[in-house]
């Protein structure tokens, strides 16, 4: 891994070549990115969008959660916003609440804590969600009956040619783990409209959420979070349980014994074994319950992102 004068090298962009992706993901699986780009800020990101060759596949990396990277890596450009586009600012505050502006590379957990410190309620559910605000927007992240849609005022996005746009929650089509993000567009920042809250009460709520997470989720081993979306009227983990797969293992890839919708890396899991385990779970659940599970995680292959298993 080294700095390079790559295909979109520029003073406003840091470019690295052949970067291992496994350490940058919560699952700790995957090969190298051909290039990794860290724009210096919004202007650097715009410059990148305008000058980087269009034939190079591109992937926006947030906190690396909800992601399985192929062992053969990614033969394109990974864009990392976490080092520069990570500001969290209170734009407005009064007796009723305030507006928190957060750049896409900021961590969701840090965002929740900054809101609490400023007496702003509504983001406590993010305290236990790994990843970044950009990723949270992309999948309308949520927990404990709350989600991004419920608190989002608007978001700033950049199109494939480097121009900025603003969209509200309705225009983004936010729904359960879904967002109508135009192809090639990148989240730059978001503004959250939050109610006034008492800092200690919010802290207690966050502590309660984190306790529930510790009790329910397998935090001992690397995972990508929930592998499948919950189908209507059911919980994915219950369907996987009913199919008799709790604890099932292929190599070092395992369906967690603690939570069946979390697939963990016991130490040296390969992407092949993890995908085989995902496909096994889908097939068994379909046979047992007649339900076709849909992936919540993405699979980054050498050619780009897939949202369905299959090599």
UniProtKB/Swiss-Prot annotation:
The active site is at 177, 226 (proton donor), 296. Its cofactor is FAD. Its EC number is 1.3.1.98. The keyword Cytoplasm applies. Disulfide bonds: none annotated. It comes from the Bacteria. Pathway: Cell wall biogenesis; peptidoglycan biosynthesis. It is an enzyme of class 1 (oxidoreductase). It is found in: Cytoplasm. NCBIfam families: murB (TIGR00179), PRK13905.1 (NF010480). Cell wall formation. This is UDP-N-acetylenolpyruvoylglucosamine reductase.
């Amino acid at each position: 891994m080294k700095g390079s004068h790559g295909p979109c090298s520029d003073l406003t962009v840091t470019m690295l070549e052949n970067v291992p992706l496994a350490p940058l993901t919560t699952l700790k699986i995957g090969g190298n990115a051909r290039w990794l780009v860290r724009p210096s800020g919004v202007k650097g990101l715009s410059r990148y969008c305008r000058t980087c060759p269009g034939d190079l596949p591109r992937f926006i990396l947030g906190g690396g959660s909800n992601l399985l990277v192929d062992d053969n890596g990614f033969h394109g450009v990974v864009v990392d916003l976490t080092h520069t586009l990570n500001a969290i600012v209170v734009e407005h505050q009064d007796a009723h609440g305030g507006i928190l502006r957060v750049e896409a590379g900021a961590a969701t957990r840090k965002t929740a804590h900054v809101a609490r410190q400023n007496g702003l309620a509504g983001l406590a559910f993010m305290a236990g969600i790994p990843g970044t605000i950009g990723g949270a927007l992309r999948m309308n992240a949520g927990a404990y009956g709350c989600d991004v849609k419920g608190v989002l005022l608007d978001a700033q996005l950049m199109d494939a040619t480097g121009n900025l746009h603003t969209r509200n929650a309705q225009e983004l089509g936010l729904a359960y783990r879904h967002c109508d993000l135009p192809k090639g567009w990148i989240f730059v920042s978001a503004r959250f409209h939050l109610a006034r809250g008492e800092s200690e009460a919010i802290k207690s709520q966050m502590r309660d959420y984190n306790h529930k997470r510790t009790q329910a989720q397998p935090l001992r081993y690397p995972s990508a979070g929930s592998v499948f979306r919950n189908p209507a009227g059911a919980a994915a983990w219950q369907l996987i349980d009913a199919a008799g797969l709790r604890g099932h293992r292929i190599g070092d890839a395992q369906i967690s014994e603690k939570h069946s919708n979390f697939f963990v890396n016991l130490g040296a899991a390969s992407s092949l074994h993890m995908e085989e385990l995902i496909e096994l779970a889908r097939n068994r659940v379909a046979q047992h319950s007649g339900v076709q599970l849909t992936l919540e995680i993405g699979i980054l292959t050498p050619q780009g992102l897939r949202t369905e298993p299959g090599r």
